[in-house]
Regions:
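Short acidic-glycine loop/turn motifs at beta-strand connectors
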Residues: 34-37, 100-102, 172-175, 181-186, ...
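Structural recognition of the beta-strand scaffold that forms the well-ordered cores
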Residues: 41-43, 105-108, 169-171, 179, ...
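Catalytic cofactor-binding cores of redox enzymes
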Residues: 151-187
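C-terminus-biased signal that marks the final domain/tail of proteins
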Residues: 27-41, 49, 55, 62, ...
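A contiguous strand-loop segment
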Residues: 27-123, 156, 325, 335-340
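Proteins synthesized as precursors that undergo proteolytic processing into mature forms
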Residues: 120-158, 162, 251-259, 267
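Sec/Tat signal peptide C-region and signal peptidase I cleavage site
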Residues: 21-27
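N-terminal export leaders
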Residues: 3-16
Length: 354
């Protein structure tokens, strides 16, 4: 992501949206702009009621990866990364968003209605919290990633001493897109135009059916303005559908950032649609990933100055994961070299204490 595109968008303004307090709704949004004519661009907001301590991570090739976090399993999946990747490390333990050197993008969002299969230890087990890490480490395209997920058993792992429902979105430079959800113990995949937008519960099929009630999609209702997942899904879908063709890759990034601002949750905002008046899940950060040109940018809600990395400038050969904390970074612009020289992570945060 380059400075011109970010300034054009007035500057870039969810680890897992973790529902630690019963009754509090969650929020995260992902949008893929793949028809703008200039670049394949993915935007994502992370909304959480606690600080996820977002850091940029650089995962080199041949890095050891493990399939489970808080569970003990005799057949947990293990691997060494085939591709280098960069993304957001949340709570010191989970890659919640990122892009690899081949341009595959992955976003991990909360979905409370997820239902995973009963564990079958004859099949290698993969934590749902490791989904983004696994696909970015090992696959170059959306279809490769889906095929890889079909060979393992994804299970609900424990983070912060409890189980979380999660779903995964995927995109690659060809324009391919997919959403992976776990419904009644089975993995379900939605591809194509129906997978360009993802928020939270209810699941994607419900969201697509609900969207038809609104004027941009043949219904009678005006666009909803609340912060609940269905309202954000409809707004994001509508604004994505009306984006003009981009004049440049910079314009494609800036235009998508405008969509993301319309689904971001301001500090103190409350959800008046679901009755969750306690809802204060503000947007912590927003990412814009240009899959065509290999740029990955992030802006913290607490810092008006965005930073980004350029994939071709990152060092993909190394001995461990490098971690660059973002809060108080005191920099703006391209931080590729800063990330290349960032400290190695020597210990993963305990999943019960992050």
């Amino acid at each position: 992501m380059r400075r011109r595109s970010l300034s054009t968008a007035a500057g870039l303004s969810l680890l897992l949206a973790l529902p630690l307090v019963p009754g509090i709704a969650n929020a995260c949004s992902r949008v893929f702009s793949n028809a703008n004519g200039k670049a394949m661009v993915v935007g994502r907001t992370m909304d959480l009621f606690i600080d996820d301590r977002a850091a940029l991570a650089l995962r080199p090739r041949a890095l050891a990866g493990g399939g489970l976090l808080g569970l003990k399993d005799a057949n947990a999946l293990h691997w060494r990364s085939r591709y280098g990747s960069t993304g957001v490390l949340s709570l010191g333990a989970v890659i919640s968003d990122g892009i690899n050197e081949r341009g595959l993008n992955a976003n991990l969002l909360y979905l409370g209605t997820s239902r995973y299969p009963d564990r079958n230890t004859a099949i290698p087990g993969l934590s749902n919290a490791k989904l983004a890490e696994y696909v970015l480490d090992n696959f170059a395209t959306v279809e490769e990633a889906i095929a890889g997920l079909e060979r393992v058993q994804v299970v609900s792992d424990r983070v912060l001493n409890r189980d979380w429902g999660l779903h995964l979105s995927l995109a690659d430079p060809s324009g391919a897109s997919a959403v992976v959800e776990f419904v009644d113990g089975s993995m379900k995949v939605k591809r194509g135009n129906d997978s360009l937008v993802m928020t939270n519960e209810p699941g994607l099929n419900w969201q697509l059916n609900n969207r038809r009630r609104y004027k941009p999609f043949g219904g009678t209702l005006p666009l909803p303005g609340d912060i609940d997942p269905p309202s954000r899904f409809v707004r994001a879908s509508a604004y994505l559908s009306t984006l003009p063709k981009a004049a440049s890759a910079d314009d494609a990034e800036a235009n998508l950032y405008g969509v993301m601002k319309n689904v971001a949750v301001p500090a103190g905002a409350r959800d008046y649609s679901t009755g969750d008046s306690e809802d204060t899940w503000m947007t912590l950060w927003t990412t814009i990933a240009n899959l065509s040109q290999g740029h990955y940018g992030i802006q913290l809600n607490s810092d008006p100055d965005p930073v980004w990395v350029t994939l071709k400038h990152l060092h993909w050969n190394g001995s461990g994961m490098r971690v660059l904390p973002l809060r108080g970074i005191g920099r703006t612009g391209d931080v590729s070299e800063l990330l290349n020289g960032a400290p190695l992570q020597t210990k993963t945060a305990p999943t019960g204490a992050v």
